[in-house]
């Protein structure tokens, strides 16, 4: 990947003025990360140094009752919603650029007083293999209400590779809340490999529960995760007197779309110049985060452009949180990208409860005379699927490739002609 060049530092160059990771919550009772590790915590990490703990996890994730380290899942402890999850928390206390003090009792803690919890999800399932889900929970930890907040993302896509930045095109689709980019000449940094399409889709934009408007046109005004109202507009979800007994399965903070979402409200794609870097925050705010403005100039004129897409403005009172979820998408062409966007929306609306394969076995290869013998354990055969509530192992599939990413074996296509599945060398049905 490309290192970031847009972050802001103090005039003496000794401190980042922006978002920095946290190892603990404010009162040091909830661990977020291992301060001795330079890795983000991942759900499938291993214990490489032999201390009994996955290397990127903090020691505070040890559960004394279970006598094991437990992943802090969003919906259940000890389990991730996805095949791979990354979790971390940051805040903006080191942003000392402006004379604003969000914590009157602590003048050293600057920024806006915001904290962000990040969760990134990815599945190995072929339906979702071209999607990464980015979930952000933004909390106003300060003592001040924030009255005009816009949430968004700044990015610099290079479609075709790090050196292939001169001929990018970009556009947006408000109907599906997606912005996207592609390469004009279809030539990448890798000889013989054509670049595809890249996009971001708003699955969940922050909610505005105080304006008296039904922002997402779902029939409920000022919907939020804090008001006790269920998906039918009546505060009875999960209660024994709910006529839909046993009630709504996901409720309040466990229901991802239970908010009055305002949607994608702006998209700018200006040239990558020093003026438009994210460190020039005042200029970016005044010129590129304007609600209702959508830049369409770059659909025909190729160049080196950045992405700035946004949702807002809205209020963020002290102590409250807003959540937004984004799908990072890739596709062979625009049609494939759009199909992936629809798949992402479907997974999101199911609260990320998506089909998962059995756990992977540990495989050992033993070389022989013009042959290799493979041995593996029974981990896959005994894994339990929480979605189907069953042991759903069906068999083993072996793939063989001379290409590191196995792309030469991804020859099975879907109905649209997009490469979809790998062709196995050997299949064996071996249910326990």
Regions found by a protein language model. Name each.
Residues 1-432:
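Extracellular/surface-associated beta-sandwich interaction domains
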